[in-house]
Amino acid sequence: MAKARTKFVCSACGADHAQWFGRCPKCHEYGSLQEEIVNAVSSGTNHRSLGAQKSRSSKVKTGQPQAALTFSQIRQENQGRFLSGYGELDRVLGGGIVPGALILIGGDPGIGKSTLLLQVAFQLATRLPRILYVSAEESGQQIKLRATRLGITQTVEPSQAQDGINNLAHDGNLFVLPETNLDDILRELEALQPQVAIIDSIQNLYFPALSSAPGSVSQVRECTGLLMQLAKRDHISLFIVGHVTKEGAIAGPKVLEHLVDTVLYFQGDRFASHRLLRSVKNRFGATQEIGIFEMVQSGLQEVLNPSQLFLGSREEFMSGTAITVACEGTRPLVVELQALVSPTSYASPRRSTTGVDYNRLLQVLAVLEKRLGVPLSKLDAYLSVAGGLEVEEPAVDLAMAIALVASFRDRVVDPTMIILGEIGLGGQIRPVSQLEIRLKEAAKLGFKKAIVPKGQTGIESAGIKLIPVGKVFAAIAVALPANENTTDQGNGSEAKIEEDLGKKD
């Protein structure tokens, strides 16, 4: 009788090792090796057929081998995308749910992943004949209780429900299966043939042919691979919920993200009600696209005008505040940057950021001190994005600089002005992408002026007065003019501004 052996699998890259290492020899990640017990194959087993045995045991029919085709011979089936019923989700997915797509969604515990997918399942059930919701974490009664609390359930008569399946949705189109055994889940998928299926969650499923525990690297990799085979073969769109680690990455091997077609992260601040659905990988649409939801008592609701969510009141504009337009994927968002510069009580001044890159703040502070002579090196500097949004693109550099100088001088920037531009180390203003889209979004909210990079010409201004600048000091002179009683900020040309400033470089 063959003995079971032990192997150590890296939770980061999925590599197998015969012995334990403190650091994975392949991906160099520390403390990532996990012990797994592997049942040895008996001497009478054909090693070459082991994979086929797994496929047969999981009821996934591999079919006949296919011959290679030329590109023109490939038949394109006329299968349109499914609309989820939520425009924000459809936007992130690139226009809807692609048949046969494998979509992975991750997020912190309690952020609302299951709530979002349950609401999506009910919406899809009003459009499609069969939707399957597989729960490995809740019973059918618990799911029904949650749906009732959210006010989205329309229960059918028990006599109309199929045996062994909790049927909750309108016209019986939504089927709920509380199960953790992958064999049973695959069997139900083949029998029911739903258009869309939801698996909650992949870390709680187990494949009986493997002896490792649910959630291990081998189990996650094998379960995802078999689900992918079935989804591609039968054109079933699959949503898979994934747990995240304490660092915020999806738990399991990186191969999990390589297998799926789309990777979505559901993000949010526990002190805020809004949630961001962000795509980091999408074979059928743009990456870094975001959808915005708000958590209310009845579940998640779409935010139709997200710029209003992240923009504070302009009636009481305070010093150190500047408005800019950030682009997340193809979506423009008008955001408010708030800066505070104050004397320090420590030997080393403090720098703190919320929603922007810390190193970006240090770079902007260095440019202001070196190129403009603004003495900020011995002052505390705090920078925050209102509303809890995280902005990573460099197009907000100029707004950061003006907000910092406005706080230093205790001055108020014109609340009808937006500020766009990337700052180079020499103090020059560099062009930004998608400028026309940003201006159109600002025009919708009533902004009248825009400080923009000087080199970007021939663009649609969308009714906004454009003030092109080439240097940081010119932009600050426009946003914070020397004459505080000036009513029309930004009438001067850059040449006149340079002359007034002594052509300081």
Swiss-Prot record:
Motif (RadA KNRFG motif): 281-285
Residues covered by region (Disordered): 485-505
Basic and acidic residues: bias regions: 495-505
Family annotation (Pfam families): AAA_25, ChlI, Zn_ribbon_LapB
Zinc finger residue extent: C4-type: 10-27
One GO process term, biological-process aspect: recombinational repair
SUPFAM superfamilies to which the protein is assigned, alphabetical: P-loop containing nucleoside triphosphate hydrolases, Ribosomal protein S5 domain 2-like
This protein's record includes keyword Transmembrane: no
Residues covered by region (Lon-protease-like): 380-505
SMART domains on file: AAA (SM00382)
Residue numbers binding ATP: 107-114
InterPro entries with a match to the protein in the record: AAA+_ATPase, DNA_repair_RadA, P-loop_NTPase, RecA_ATP-bd, Ribosomal_Su5_D2-typ_SF, Ribsml_uS5_D2-typ_fold_subgr, Rubredoxin_2
EC number: 3.6.4.-
Keywords: ATP-binding, DNA damage, DNA repair, DNA-binding, Hydrolase, Metal-binding, Nucleotide-binding, Stress response, Zinc, Zinc-finger
Alphabetized GO MF terms: ATP binding; ATP hydrolysis activity; ATP-dependent DNA damage sensor activity; damaged DNA binding; zinc ion binding
Gene3D superfamilies cross-referenced by the UniProt entry: 3.30.230.10, P-loop containing nucleotide triphosphate hydrolases
NCBIfam families, alphabetized: sms
Domain notes: Has a putative N-terminal zinc-finger, a middle region with homology to RecA with ATPase motifs including the RadA KNRFG motif, while the C-terminus is homologous to Lon protease.
Protein family per UniProt: Belongs to the RecA family. RadA subfamily.
Stated role: DNA-dependent ATPase involved in processing of recombination intermediates, plays a role in repairing DNA breaks. Stimulates the branch migration of RecA-mediated strand transfer reactions, allowing the 3' invading strand to extend heteroduplex DNA faster. Binds ssDNA in the presence of ADP but not other nucleotides, has ATPase activity that is stimulated by ssDNA and various branched DNA structures, but inhibited by SSB. Does not have RecA's homology-searching function.
HAMAP family assigned: RadA_bact
Name the record gives this protein: DNA repair protein RadA
Organism: Synechocystis sp. (strain ATCC 27184 / PCC 6803 / Kazusa)
Gene: radA
